[in-house]
């Protein structure tokens, strides 16, 4: 989560901490015409001509840039310089960013998108500690949801409710490391159920059947585990697909890629159909 010029918006990416200037650049990128949210809105508008108008707006969850502890050069709000050694200043910066996201989203007047909540991009609380709890209070006051996706057994994963999150998705962290056995997926599904968590489905373009060092079988293992544990029927699911994993699978001419895409698509369509019937 960085700007491509060396500045980071979360822990663990680069050493240079993003300042208010970089936060504003990120906001401009999120709401840039023809990109990101605007492109998504246009895409849905185009598809409506083919499949008809849905009975709902697509819900959007936007990530929050993290106020990085010990940062002193972030900038000012209302003329007051902020020091992220102080948690109160971290909360103030997060509130400012949330306000910016909400204001710009409203101003954009998207036809097909609804801002439903915010996502905490840190995948553990080793450094941010209990900061999410105080940010959550502001988010809930705005009547929005607070979402988290901790990595496998990350610090604080089993405290997600106490930290103020409305939903947390368990990352199996299986797809990308080939020496992790498929049993990790069973364990992740069971762990998520035990702690009241949802699940994340992970893949990228390495899932292509004919690509070098293919991870096709690992994506297949996710689908099988989710079927075996009734995740598709009973759980919320977040999908991490790299930059264009599903797009590459869609464009592939391989029969095996079509087979796995169809298998996943059937579950997604069934989930949407069930949801529509219950409304």
Predicted regions and their residues:
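N-terminal catalytic cores of secreted or lumenal carbohydrate-active enzymes
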Residues: 1-92
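Alpha-helix N-cap and loop-to-helix initiation/capping positions
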Residues: 35, 82-96, 127-130, 180, ...
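Surface-exposed amphipathic alpha-helices with a cationic face
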Residues: 48-52, 102, 131-145, 189-193
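Short helix-terminating capping/connector loops at secondary-structure junctions
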Residues: 51-57, 110-115, 231-234
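Aromatic-lined carbohydrate-recognition surfaces of secreted/lumenal glycan-active proteins
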Residues: 55-73, 77-98, 114-125, 136-157, ...
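Alpha-helical scaffolding within the catalytic cores
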Residues: 98-106, 133, 151-159, 183-188
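Aromatic- and acid-rich polysaccharide-binding/catalytic face
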Residues: 110-124, 157, 161-179
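Substrate-binding cleft of secreted/luminal carbohydrate-active enzymes
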Residues: 153, 164-279
